[in-house]
């Protein structure tokens, strides 16, 4: 059993993708990285912004079992603050700086039958706009189920492997090239941003 954050990873697919992402962004001090595949996350920051399309494949309260499940989880009426406190995108938006140093991998198929590509893209945009470095893949021609999940899962595990043993992609050659490019940027009045593996460089 690994003790401490380093070497502690969490991953999952679909509902498990949402759960793993939620756990990682709620408790980034616990995990070194998360690999979330096709996470069942609604593209919204508030419960009232969820659309009919976003409810496909999820409990929507239409049937008795759904109503019981929603009441058990979120209360009756829905506790919207509690919902936001457990929604990955809303958690990220509230305080993105907590995620600096957390390895984050998101992926989804662009043919997802539950439209989960919409929610995954939404989470990606929240992270991107906050300047939090992460890896995101929209897999061309892939659905929520099927043969694509095998290579996609291997890609997710490869990401985890890179967190265990980070490749030296920014080597001396790259640093020299960056230094030359930075001088050119300065001369032309462009902003210069230093290399930071935790932030998107343009932020």
For each of these PLM feature ranges, what is it?
Residues 1-203:
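Non-catalytic cap/lid and distal C-terminal segments of serine-dependent acyl enzymes
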